[in-house]
């Protein structure tokens, strides 16, 4: 039951990020992406009609210059905060104050919320009772250009956008790499073991978490390369040592109900 609920929530969240290109086909990105400043002066990227996390041009340059990401089509990043006090209401941004960065090196400034996130107030505050919050960044590359997208926390059905102005790249959570000669083969490397606050890590479920994520993530990959299926190899590490999960995602999987 929990798995079905989680996948349903996941599917809804992924749908928020599935856009159309100029030809009306899903999976594309708007051309002419531009940056704006939010109320506290932090850079935020707007794309596909919504706000998108943009950890500054410096972070983008660091990412593109990092040889470990040379062939990655998608990079997932995480920053964990602890000892955070939150203020705000359903119509304004939640401001994170006095927060110490537990993992990564991005100084938190505010959590920018969409109107649909008002109902998540109680869940958000209940989680903060644990004095920590993890925020994920989702970065994709199209034709050699990096695009930044906000990504949900593992605990919520809503999506949180975190603005920052430090220009320092957060800790890498996972990398997705497709074989250039055979795009049907996709390799995923997880670093969840580095994040002690991660609920997915503590419960020993990184494989199921990323397996669910990959189902939605690979939809764009399959359509982009006109594939019938994708073979995903997920490498991760737990307290029991190195683990590997293999999963095949077929095009027809996206037409089946979760």
Kindly label every feature range from the protein language model.
Residues 1-5:
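Positively charged n-region of N-terminal signal peptides that target proteins for export
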Residues 6-12:
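Sec-dependent N-terminal signal peptides
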Residues 15-19:
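C-terminal motif of bacterial Sec signal peptides marking the signal peptidase cleavage site
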Residues 21-24:
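Bacterial signal peptide processing site
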Residues 27:
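Cys/His-rich zinc-coordinating "finger/knuckle" motifs
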Residues 30-258:
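First exposed extracellular module after export/assembly in secreted or surface-exposed proteins
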């Amino acid at each position: 039951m929990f798995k079905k609920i989680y996948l349903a929530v996941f599917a809804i969240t992924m749908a928020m990020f599935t856009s159309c290109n100029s030809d009306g086909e899903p999976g594309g990105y708007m051309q002419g992406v531009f940056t704006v400043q939010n109320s506290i002066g932090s850079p935020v990227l707007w794309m596909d009609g919504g706000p998108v996390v943009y950890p500054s041009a410096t972070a983008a340059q660091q990412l593109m210059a990092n040889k470990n990401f040379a062939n990655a089509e998608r990079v997932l990043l995480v920053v964990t905060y602890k000892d955070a006090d939150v203020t705000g209401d359903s119509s304004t941004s939640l401001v994170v104050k006095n927060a110490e960065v537990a993992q990564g090196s991005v100084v938190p400034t505010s959590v920018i919320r969409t109107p649909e996130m008002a109902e998540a107030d109680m869940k958000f505050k209940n989680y903060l009772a644990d004095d920590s919050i993890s925020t994920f960044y989702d970065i994709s590359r199209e034709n050699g250009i990096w695009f930044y997208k906000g990504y949900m926390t593992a605990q919520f059905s809503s999506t949180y956008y975190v603005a920052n102005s430090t220009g320092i790249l957060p800790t890498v959570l996972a990398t997705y790499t497709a074989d250039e000669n055979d795009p049907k083969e996709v390799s995923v490397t997880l670093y969840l073991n580095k994040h002690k606050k991660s609920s997915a890590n503590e419960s020993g479920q990184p494989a199921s978490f990323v397996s669910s994520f990959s189902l939605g993530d690979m939809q764009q990959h399959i359509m982009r390369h006109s594939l019938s299926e994708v073979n995903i190899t997920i490498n991760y590490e737990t307290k029991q040592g190195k683990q590997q999960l293999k999963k095949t995602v077929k095009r027809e999987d996206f037409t089946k109900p979760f």
